[in-house]
């Protein structure tokens, strides 16, 4: 369960995920300079529409994919609130893959591995880029790019993983079914 893990907020405070017991949680690694950055808009809409019903969103900025999350935690927060009016909690910029990855992400990936990209304008580009770098990329559970999302149910179980190419409507349906 995710309740065994902690993250650090953008303000440097430790946040135990046990605080989210009884809530549906959407965990997403983000970046401010990515082609998927406009996903902040529908994420904020999800938060506004379902927060009162028990949805929490954890925004975890990550600079591991194309260095697309430059700046300090404060600068990232300012960007998101200024351009997308985000109100959901934003965590400290962190790694989601590799030796310095958050333990939370080690757990998330162990529960829901990569199952492929959905049809999207960036699908071919992403697949080409990854296969050139690593022929075995598709068989690894690693986070592939910014805006990969994990949905956690009210009991703390990871129930779904959505790649950045997933339609937000699919994510919303998954969340609604759990609320």
Identify the residue ranges that each predicted region occupies.
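Thiol/selenol-based redox catalytic cores and closely related redox-interacting motifs
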Residues: 79-81, 85-166
């Amino acid at each position: 369960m995710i309740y065994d893990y902690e993250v650090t907020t953008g303000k440097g405070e430790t946040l135990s995920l046990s605080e989210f017991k009884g809530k549906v949680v959407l965990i997403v690694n983000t970046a401010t300079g990515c082609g998927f950055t406009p996903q902040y808009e529908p994420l904020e809409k999800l938060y506004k529409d379902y927060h009162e019903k028990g949805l929490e969103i954890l925004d975890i900025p990550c600079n591991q994919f194309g260095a697309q999350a430059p700046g300090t935690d404060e600068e990232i927060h300012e960007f998101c609130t200024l351009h997308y009016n985000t109100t959901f909690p934003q965590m400290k910029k962190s790694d989601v893959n590799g030796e310095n990855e958050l333990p939370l992400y080690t757990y998330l990936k162990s529960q829901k591995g990569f199952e492929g990209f959905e049809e999207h304008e960036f699908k071919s580009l992403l697949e080409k880029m990854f296969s050139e770098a690593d022929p075995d990329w598709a068989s690894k559970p690693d986070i592939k790019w910014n805006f990969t999302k994990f949905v956690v149910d009210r009991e703390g179980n990871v129930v779904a993983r959505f790649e950045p190419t997933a339609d937000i409507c699919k994510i919303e349906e998954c969340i609604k079914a759990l609320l």
